[in-house]
Amino acid sequence: MQRVQPSAARVKSQKKEKAPPDVPDVILDGERKTRYEKGKFLGKGGFAHCYELRNKSTGELFAGKVVPKALLIKQYQRDKMAQEVQIHRNLQHRNVVKLYHFFEDKSNVYITLELCPRRSLMELHKRRKAVTEPEARYFTYQIVEGVLYLHNLKIVHRDLKLGNLFLNDELQVKIGDFGLATTCDNDERKKTLCGTPNYIAPEVLNKIGHSFEVDLWAIGCILYILLFGHPPFESKSLEETYSRIKNNNYVIPTSASAAASQLIRVLLDPVPSRRPNARAVCRDHFFKSGFMPARLPVSCLTMVPHLNDDEYAEENVSPSGTIDQRGPHQAGRSGLSAIPAHLVSRNSERQQTHRMEAYRQPTDCYLSNLLAQVNDLLATPTADIDDAEAALDSYQSPEALPVFWISKWVDYSDKYGIGYQLCDNSVGVLFNDNSRIMLDTAGTQLTYIEKTEKEHYFDMESAIPSGLQKKMTLLKYFRSYMNDHLLQAGQQVTRKVGDDLARLPTLRVWFRTKSAIVLHLSNGTVQINFFNDHIKMVLCPLMQAVTFIDENKRMFTYKFSHLAENGCPEKFLHRIQYAKCMIQRLVEEHTKEETKHNAPAANAVRLPSTSSNVRLESAADIQPAYPSSSRR
């Protein structure tokens, strides 16, 4: 295999890369006599690297922000960090990341923070682009509540953006990173030029003085990104972006509801004094104009939620019902009356159609995108340097970890299909007739997908249609088999509010070779499990990253761009080359099916295996009968 030496520029850039801090495996907070065990790497930004920390006495988990003292040489750097801690340490709000402690040793400064395992809205944006209006209401309302709390304490955040809005396991928004935050009196105006280009307010760029209003401008940008998938003033150059901001040059897509458009316009008003304050935004009609979930399931991080027709329709017309008295951030599906179909205008129907187009995936579920990304990586001259493997830890990208992957599978395709378990313990079956069935972790929500992609949702507490009973029996058999033979016993999971919104990724296509099993999920990820050493490889076209899971369940994630720039070690390179061949095969099969049927072919199929001559029996005689309430 031909290997190419890195260019001088690349070697230079590698040397410039900040080395990770020297962090001991056990960290001592001497003042509190507390010991923390260093866990997995969480990410980096600025001078800091973040690790999961476990209190050795209590077992509690924290996010540990570590800054080497060697990088805090100048007084202004030390002052900036002291101010960040001083502002953040006393904040107590459900929508603000909690800062617990601040301490140091001879080498590093440590800050222990509330752990947010579901990363940030930035990762959600990369996977989903535009989200539904109910989701936008859910996230934006929490952001505004957190900002209202800060403003009541005379704190201006000044760097609100997707990457600083973190998510816990319940997908609650937590405002974090107070590195640019400042305190401000009502009539005071700050002159510092600070912020992030796509979110920065015009008064900051024009240096006329700024205050609390910059946070409301940023919320307008965030709401716009959530709804339409890109920043309102984004361009190919920083100069052009700033020009658009100064001239208030942006366009609201016609798919937006009237309430969303109006809120965006007032938040992005170029005159700061005309923007509403955070309290007024909390009362805005947008949050009452349609369905707002009380809670969102984790599947929303990667899949469009399951919303019924009424909930989509509510986005576009004034609701005939009202938010219940629990407050808009707590209102569930029962909080709004259904809108009669005859009240939805033709224009609303067009808006709904346009918006649904924005959520629709390509028919190949991103296979062609992934193939292009892998081709680009393999076409890049690979750095053949002695320390390429040693340097891997410094450019891991844990923020790009997959949300879902297949943890277990069992092949009964000679008669029925393939059963599998996702990493959240939900269980599914891809039948030989290309239909799919999925049962969530709690065992309460059932999804059935016809080979035509029509979806049906059922509550397990209600009657399942008689036509589905045979497939339900098979699902239970697969689930029982995996529980008895493959899975470790997990804790009992109870049903939660919002579980009915979940749309879990399902297995679309799979095949086996002599070396591996190849699995393609409906959220775009391709997973390859190697038989000889039990390594799993998960490639994600949306995060443009690859994750390796070893036999000890340790996960290592790298962005394709980082592997291209810093060098791809031999142990990864040959697997990625193998993945390219497998993805190429998936793409070719999709193209063949699409041509054959002369229509979008997102149907789930098993490709012929290269390692066996298993006969695939048809299950076409299983034709379920659906109740009239079945939903797409």
Curated annotation (Swiss-Prot):
InterPro entries: Kinase-like_dom_sf, POLO_box_1, POLO_box_2, POLO_box_dom, POLO_box_dom_sf, Prot_kinase_dom, Protein_kinase_ATP_BS, Ser/Thr_kinase_AS. Disruption phenotype: Mutants are viable and fertile but about 30-percent of the progeny die at the embryonic stage. Surviving adults are mostly male. Impaired chromosome pairing and synapsis during meiotic prophase. Asymmetric disassembly of the synaptonemal complex fails at the diplotene stage. Partial mis-segregation of chromosomes. Increased germline apoptosis. Simultaneous knockdown of plk-1 and plk-2 causes a loss in pie-1 polarization in the 1-cell embryo, an increased association with the oocyte pronuclei and a decrease in pie-1 degradation in embryonic somatic cells. Residues 36-287 form the Protein kinase domain. The keyword Cell membrane does not apply. Its EC number is 2.7.11.21. Residues 405-484, 506-588 form the POLO box domain. ATP binds at L42, G43, K44, G45, G46, F47, A48, H49, C50, K65. One of its GO terms (cellular component) is kinetochore. Residues 1-26, 313-334 are annotated as: Disordered. One of its GO terms (biological process) is regulation of meiosis I. SUPFAM superfamilies: Polo-box domain, Protein kinase-like (PK-like). Coiled coil: none annotated. Gene3D superfamilies: Phosphorylase Kinase, domain 1, POLO box domain, Transferase(Phosphotransferase) domain 1. Its main location: nucleus. Its cofactor is Mg(2+). GO terms for molecular function: ATP binding; protein serine kinase activity; protein serine/threonine kinase activity. Pfam families: Pkinase, POLO_box. The active site is at D159 (proton acceptor). Keywords: ATP-binding, Centromere, Chromosome, Cytoplasm, Cytoskeleton, Kinase, Kinetochore, Meiosis, Nucleotide-binding, Nucleus, Repeat, Serine/threonine-protein kinase, Transferase. Changing P197L: In vv44; Loss of proper chromosome pairing and early initiation of synapsis resulting in a loss of chiasma formation and chromosome segregation during oocyte meiosis I. The keyword Nucleotidyltransferase does not apply. Expressed in oocytes. Interacts (via POLO box domain) with mex-5 and mex-6. Interacts (via POLO box domain) with him-8 (via N-terminus); the interaction mediates plk-2 recruitment to the pairing region of X chromosomes during meiosis. Interacts with sun-1. May interact with nicotinic acetylcholine receptor. Belongs to the protein kinase superfamily. Ser/Thr protein kinase family. CDC5/Polo subfamily. This is Serine/threonine-protein kinase plk-2. It comes from Caenorhabditis elegans. The lineage of its organism: Eukaryota, Metazoa, Ecdysozoa, Nematoda, Chromadorea. The gene is plk-2.
